[in-house]
Amino acid sequence: MANYAVFDIGGTAIKCAVTDGGGCFREKERLVNPARTEGVGAMIALLVHRLRDYGTAYPLTGIGVATAGVVDAATGTIACDAMNIPDYRGTRLKTILSEAAGLPVAVENDVNCA
């Protein structure tokens, strides 16, 4: 059965989960987003750390990300800063996470995912 790591990135919290894509959550958690106090790099490090943990526990098939900010969905790059995530613009989220996990990644604005 397929497993997907999914993230909902907001200004204050990041919701993380592993799902089978059919509505069953194998694991889920809510973490404080460190971007406001420690910078975007700390947020990226947290995402990569969770991906590695999830990948150890479950055979992952892909990664899905819903995030605050304007997203170029084709490239998975943050096209415009999110008001609550400083210096987010230009972050190549899709590339970073794909390279870290070796998996396909989809990134979209969180409102479009609701």
Residue ranges and their predicted role:
Residues 2-45, 58, 78-79:
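Short glycine-rich, Thr/Ser-proximal phosphate-binding strand/loop in the N-terminal lobe
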Residues 44-63, 101-105:
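Phosphate/pyrophosphate-binding loops at sites that engage ATP/ADP/AMP, CoA/4′-phosphopantetheine
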Residues 63-69:
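Glycine-rich beta-strand-to-loop/alpha-helix junction loops that act as flexible
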